[in-house]
Amino acid sequence: MARVKRGVIARKRHKKILKLAKGYYGARSRVFRVAKQAVIKAGQYAYRDRRQKKRQFRALWIARINAGARVNGLSYSRFIAGLKKASIEIDRKVLADLAVNEKAAFAAIVEKAKATLA
């Protein structure tokens, strides 16, 4: 049986990792052993942050809605309670956008929520 050396496979593997590490600082983009660790760590961060992104955006939307609601004389929790009672189903992403860009429309929604609570 002929002896098989791994030269071609190893080079392919190394090139793949070094391609993924392109743009990294110093040895992290040039040395295979260091680059491999950097790529693995980057993958872990990417995986974690894809999940955290959802939480962070929701928190941002809530902060924006709260600010807009308080300008109109209502707290966030009372505003959301009013929307639920009035059976207005607008998600937080849209509400946050209205609070920032369409202040008059947001104020009208807040007034409806206030009227339902009263």
From Swiss-Prot:
Pfam families cross-referenced by the UniProt entry: Ribosomal_L20
Top-rank lineage group of the source organism: Bacteria
Family matches, as Gene3D superfamilies: 6.10.160.10, Ribosomal protein L20
One Gene Ontology term of the molecular function aspect: rRNA binding
Annotated InterPro entries: Ribosomal_bL20 (IPR005813), RIBOSOMAL_L20_CS (IPR049946), Ribosomal_protein_bL20_C (IPR035566)
GO biological process assignments: ribosomal large subunit assembly; translation
Gene Ontology CC: one annotated term: ribosome
CDD domains: Ribosomal_L20 (cd07026)
Protein purpose: Binds directly to 23S ribosomal RNA and is necessary for the in vitro assembly process of the 50S ribosomal subunit. It is not involved in the protein synthesizing functions of that subunit.
Family: Belongs to the bacterial ribosomal protein bL20 family.
Protein name: Large ribosomal subunit protein bL20
Organism: Pseudomonas syringae pv. tomato (strain ATCC BAA-871 / DC3000)
